[in-house]
Structures are given as C-alpha cells and as structure tokens.
Design a protein with these regions (language model features):
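Core SAM-dependent methyltransferase catalytic element
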Residues: 188-205
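Conserved beta-strand signature within the Rossmann-like core of class I S-adenosyl-L-methionine
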Residues: 148-156
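Class I SAM-dependent methyltransferase SAM/SAH-binding core
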Residues: 61-111
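Short, small-residue-biased leader/transition segments that mark boundaries at the very start
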Residues: 1-7
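Conserved alpha-helix/loop element of class I SAM-dependent methyltransferases that forms part
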Residues: 39-57
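A short acidic, Gly/Pro-enriched loop at the edge of an enzyme's catalytic core
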Residues: 112-122
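Class I SAM-dependent methyltransferase Rossmann-like catalytic core
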Residues: 26-40
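A short glycine-rich, Lys/Arg-flanked "PGG" loop and its adjoining helix->strand segment in the class I
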Residues: 136-147
Length: 205
C-alpha cells in the first residue's frame, strides 16, 4: 500500500518488506491506519471486479491479501471461494477467521506454487507499490488463471512507469495474453494524495 516517502528507500529486498509489514501489523496498527487514511483500494477494485465476474462460485486468488480487506469486500459481493496469499505472516494472522478458504505465506516475486489454470480470477490490490512486487508477477497471474478469467489489480501511480508496469501491460496485450476491460486512475488513498491505476484484464488462452 504505502506512500513513496514511507518506503521507497527503506525496502530493498524481500526480507525487509516482510519485516516492515510484520512490524506494521503489531497491535493491529495496519488496519487502523487503513481506516484513518481512508484507503478505498479494496472497495473500489472489488466493485469493478464484481461487475464483470458474475459467477459467485468463482475460485479467486487474492495476491497480497494482507489482513483480508479485499476478502471482506468479496464476501459483501457474494463471493465465497477465495484464497489469500501474502508475504507477511503477521498480517495473515490478523485475517478474520473463516474469511478465506485457504491462506498461504507467499513471495509473489517468485513463481507461484499453483497449477496452470487453477483459478477463475486473480485480485491484487495494494501490492504493486514501492519496493514490493514487480511486473513479472502479472505473467504468473495469467498462468494460474483460466481462459476468460479476470485479473484485477492496482498499481501505485508512482511506480507505473518507473518499475516498467506500463511496458509489461502493453507487452501482454501485444502477445494476446489478455485484453483490457478497464484501466483508469483511482483515488486509492485520497487522504495521503496517493493515486493508483486500477486495471481489469481478461485472460486469453
């Protein structure tokens, strides 16, 4: 999630990212900050996703699920079969009981230990930001998603071009691996003046 000032120079590798979020999760400070900051990413992204993913039994992979904010929104929209993955064990421990079918500690900068076409859709909200998950993860999301499935994500506007997400997104379109459904700038964390690109793409196989 975070802002550039908080984490650009602090998070240099996976271990530091994990430590940062484990510390942020202490005393449930993470969720309190999300409320205080008026973090709208999960709500807005899930609203867009639910407009196109009509099957409420769809098997969904929530990549970078944190404390389950996206899961809460998915449940509100009637979805019930979703799995969560996050790098921070501490944040996973704060996920409400019985919200997800399965929770796993995963480094999304590495190949995801899932079969090809295992999921109907992938959600990734607040994870493409400074010092976090890089563009190659998008190819892994496509790999684990079935044909015609959806990949819905946010990208912090500060890294969209700097990290090469703009080029990766276009490359995947040119390679006919997915097609754009929606892509627009959202407020994300309005109270901190942090915007993000919100994308919804449909997988082609």
């Amino acid at each position: 999630v975070g802002s550039e000032m908080c984490i650009r120079d602090r998070l240099k590798d996976t271990v530091e990212v994990m430590k940062y979020y484990d510390e942020w999760g202490d005393g449930n400070k993470y969720d309190k900050d999300m409320v205080d900051w008026n973090y709208t990413g999960p709500k807005e992204t899930t609203k867009v996703f639910s407009e196109f993913q009509k099957n409420k039994d769809a098997k969904i992979y929530d990549a970078g699920c944190g404390t389950g904010l996206v899961g809460v929104e998915l449940k509100k929209h009637g979805f019930k079969n979703f799995h969560g993955a996050d790098l921070s064990k501490k944040l996973l421990e704060l996920v409400p009981n019985d919200l997800y079918e399965k929770l796993e500690q995963v480094d999304l900068n590495k190949p995801i230990n899932k079969k090809d076409n295992e999921y109907d859709s992938v959600m990734c909200v607040g994870t493409f930001t400074f010092g976090h998950v890089k563009p190659p993860a998008l190819e892994e999301f496509i790999r684990i998603t079935k044909n015609d499935g959806f990949i819905c994500f946010t990208i912090n506007e500060g890294i969209h071009e700097e990290y090469g997400f703009d080029k990766k997104i276009e490359q995947l379109k040119e390679q006919n691996k997915w097609k754009e459904i929606k892509f627009f700038k959202s407020d994300y964390i309005a109270s901190k003046d942090v915007n993000a690109w919100l994308g919804l793409y449909q997988v082609i196989k």
